[in-house]
Amino acid sequence: MKKIIICILTAGFITNCAVENPENINTDITQTYFTEFMACKAGPDQSTATMTSMIGEWQQLLEGDSLVGSWGYAPAVATNSSEDTIWWELQWTSQDDANIAWEAWLQNEDAAAWEEKYTSVLDCDGENRQSFDTAYPMASNAFGELPDSGYFYAEILFCTYENGGTKEDALGFLAGFNNAVNKGGYEGTSYHYGNYFQQGNEDGFLWGNFTNSKESMDKATD
C-alpha cells in the first residue's frame, strides 16, 4: 500500500446516524455506492434538543426508499483540517435516484418550510454537495455492535496515489487489508471503514475509519 497510496489524517469526528436502512449484504467488497456530502455550519440555536427535533421532522419529510443511510459528522478535536464544519453524509441507492429525490425535495413546500425553520440550528450547502463512489468493505458489526445511542467515532484520512496508483489499485488492496484486520485483535471496537472516491478527482480518495469510541479508535489504529 505504501508504494501506491499515502494517507494523512485530516479530521476526527463524533458521528451520529440519522437514518439507516438494513445493511447491504453484497459480498463484493469492491462494489461502490453513490454517496454525497454536504458542508454545514452550526447556527446560534443549535443544541441537542433542537438537533433532535430537526432530524425527527426531516425524517417525516422523506419519501420513498432511495436514501439508504444518513450520518452527521461533528468535529471532535480543534485540530480538524475542516475546522468547525459539520458534514452531512447521504448514501443513496443510485445517483439517478438521488437526483430524482433532490428534485422532489426542491419542489416540496414542507421541505422549504423545514429549512427555514431550522436555518438557525444547522445551515447546510445542499447546492454544492460533493459526490462520491464509496466502497464499504467491512460490515459495521464485524467487531461488535455500535452504541444504541447512534453516536460513534470517526477518523478521516486523505489518501493520495503515488507511482501511478489508481482507484483500481486502492480497491485491489481491500481484500488483503480485511485479512489483516481480521487477525488484528479488533474485537469490541466496532471497527469498520469506508473508501470514498470523489467523482472527478483522480489524485486520491478519503479513507474513513469508524469505531464505537475514541479509545477503540486508538486501539484499532495503533
Predicted regions and their residues:
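Sec-dependent N-terminal signal peptides
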Residues: 4-13
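Short S/T/G/P-rich N-terminal loop/turn motif that feeds into the first structured element of a domain
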Residues: 17-87, 91-222
